[in-house]
Amino acid sequence: IAVGANISDLHNLLQTADIISVHVPLSKETVDLISVNELGMMKSSAILINAARGGVVNESALAEALETNSIRGAATDVFSQEPPTQNNPLLNLSEITAQKVFLTPHIAGITTQAWTDLFIKSWENIQNYFEGKEVVNRKL
């Protein structure tokens, strides 16, 4: 590939990457995509970023991997239950482990511009539907 990137399957990626950033939708196929086995394949120096959806990374398995230093660190702005409850394992890490983790709220879509774009695109799709035109990003 021209930019120097390599195509890799998930298992090879987990074993070799220094930073793994997850960006997949939540579906039957991606629930717990990253769990005990996958975290065990990662290098102890690896950092996991979940920018996908809650449920893609098993939070209990991630907390255990962090507590046992199986991986170096993690960051996420999504949780299996949002907002996360007080018993979420990522909110109950030891003080030392918590220093290796960035947890932020999932608020990317709460800007004025995001809402404006959402309403404009929604209205355009409604008009397109009734005019027999293509509905953009249609999910059946």
Each predicted region: which residue ranges?
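Rossmann-like dinucleotide-binding domain for NAD(H)/NADP(H)
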Residues: 45, 51-140
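Rossmann-like dinucleotide/phosphate-binding beta-alpha-beta segment
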Residues: 1-44
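A generic structural signal for short
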Residues: 27, 50-51
